[in-house]
UniProtKB/Swiss-Prot annotation:
<keyword id="KW-0808">Transferase</keyword>
<feature type="domain" description="THUMP">
    <location>
        <begin position="50"/>
        <end position="147"/>
    </location>
</feature>
<keyword id="KW-0694">RNA-binding</keyword>
<dbReference type="InterPro" id="IPR002052">
    <property type="entry name" value="DNA_methylase_N6_adenine_CS"/>
</dbReference>
<comment type="similarity">
    <text>Belongs to the methyltransferase superfamily. Trm-G10 family.</text>
</comment>
<keyword id="KW-0963">Cytoplasm</keyword>
<dbReference type="Pfam" id="PF02926">
    <property type="entry name" value="THUMP"/>
</dbReference>
<protein>
    <recommendedName>
        <fullName>tRNA (guanine(10)-N2)-dimethyltransferase</fullName>
        <ecNumber>2.1.1.213</ecNumber>
    </recommendedName>
</protein>
<dbReference type="GO" id="GO:0005737">
    <property type="term" value="C:cytoplasm"/>
</dbReference>
<dbReference type="GO" id="GO:0030488">
    <property type="term" value="P:tRNA methylation"/>
</dbReference>
<keyword id="KW-0820">tRNA-binding</keyword>
<comment type="function">
    <text>Catalyzes the adenosylmethionine-dependent methylation of the exocyclic amino group (N(2)) of guanosine at position 10 of various tRNAs. Acts via a two-step process that leads to the formation of either N(2)-monomethyl (m(2)G) or N(2)-dimethylguanosine (m(2)(2)G).</text>
</comment>
<dbReference type="InterPro" id="IPR005885">
    <property type="entry name" value="TrmG10"/>
</dbReference>
<dbReference type="GO" id="GO:0000049">
    <property type="term" value="F:tRNA binding"/>
</dbReference>
<comment type="subunit">
    <text>Monomer.</text>
</comment>
<dbReference type="InterPro" id="IPR053943">
    <property type="entry name" value="RlmKL-like_Mtase_CS"/>
</dbReference>
<dbReference type="GO" id="GO:0160102">
    <property type="term" value="F:tRNA (guanine(10)-N2)-methyltransferase activity"/>
</dbReference>
Length: 336
């Protein structure tokens, strides 16, 4: 089935990378039909939308593609569609303009009238059973039926200051979810965050059914992470006090997802960043299964490429400007 995923435009690359990583990690047979700023059209099994709804962070909606039409020919194209295949009980038509401009209100009424005449069903602008979503891209429409909305409620409610245990400097739940997805794990896999802090990354992984292991050198963070995980109903976890550089697990993990502390702080015992990262990579190699991925954040001023040796390969790299003096760089690194 052809489906359209409306992506967040908070970053030019991360949303698309996250989508494709989830599709691959879930073993879904898919192909990319079309991609652009704010969207991708893929061909995948129908059940795919349920997986994407549960996992994606940087996405808005998932829709079934009904057809394509020139911007000035949408009403004629709508006349050719058997709407009884797509509309049930009640419906609404709402145009989304990614690029370009049209008289949305007039077109929505026109298409709505066509559907109503074809099906005899009522229009419900408040809570429609079916939402028909024509998406304008330059001079054409992709005509879709919405299947799912990616809820933002969790990302608002799980912000660091709303958790039982809070400590400044924690990563946003949306970026944490994205990084877990970029690591290529799926439900049942096991991940490690050796700088777990307040547990934000582990929370997002645990909510997706991933088994989580966390470590931190600070007992306050260890206890706080346990409290936060339990608050979100996550039970399959292990959180231990350990220096990330000395950590040796009995069982290798499928991925490591982490946001190591920047610069010099108590949690790094005053060590310089380069030395900390180099020793962390030694530990990561011991704890990560062959072919497993590390998805980690680092400040732009750290030349991590110079610290990577033949044991690892950098697969992806994304920069996120945080403020004037800091850009966060997300890297996906494979253990070879």
């Amino acid at each position: 089935m052809e489906m359209m995923v409306l992506l967040s435009q908070e970053h030019p690359e991360l949303p698309s990378a996250e989508l494709r990583s989830v599709l691959m990690s879930e073993g879904i047979d898919f192909s990319v039909i079309e991609s652009g700023s704010g969207y991708e059209v893929i061909d995948a099994p129908r059940s795919t939308w349920k997986i994407l709804k549960k996992r994606l962070a940087y996405a808005h909606e998932i829709s079934e593609v009904i057809g394509y039409a020139a911007a000035d020919d949408l009403d004629d194209a709508a006349e050719e569609i058997d709407w009884s295949k797509y509309v049930r009980e009640s419906f609404a038509v709402r145009i989304r303009k990614l690029c370009g401009d049209v008289d949305s209100r007039t077109l929505e009424r026109t298409i709505g009238a066509i559907i109503k005449e074809d099906t005899g069903l009522k229009v419900d602008l408040e809570k429609p059973w079916t939402l028909i979503r024509p998406v304008l891209i330059n001079d054409r429409f992709i005509l879709t039926r919405r299947l799912a909305v990616i809820s933002k409620e969790h990302f608002n409610q799980a912000r660091p200051h709303k958790r039982p245990f809070f400590y400044p400097g924690s990563m946003s739940p949306k970026l944490a979810r994205c990084m877990v997805n970029l690591s290529g794990v799926k439900a049942g896999d096991r991940i490690l965050d050796p700088f777990c802090g307040t547990g934000g990354i582990l929370i997002e992984a645990g909510l997706m059914g991933v088994r989580v292991v966390g470590a931190d050198i600070d007992w306050r963070m260890v206890e706080g992470t346990r409290e936060n995980l339990q608050h979100y109903g996550i039970t399959d976890f292990e959180v231990i006090r350990s220096d990330a550089r000395d950590l040796r697990l009995d069982e290798k993990v499928d991925a490591i997802v982490t946001d190591p502390p920047y610069g010099i702080s108590a949690s790094t015992a005053g060590e310089k960043s380069e030395k900390l990262y180099r020793e962390f990579l030694d530990s990561a190699h011991s704890n990560l299964a062959e072919g497993g991925m590390i998805c980690m954040a680092a400040p732009h001023y750290l030349d991590l490429e110079s610290l990577i040796d033949e044991r690892f390969s950098i697969r992806e790299r994304y920069s996120m400007r945080m403020h004037r003096s800091l850009t966060r760089v997300i890297r996906v690194i494979e253990r070879v």
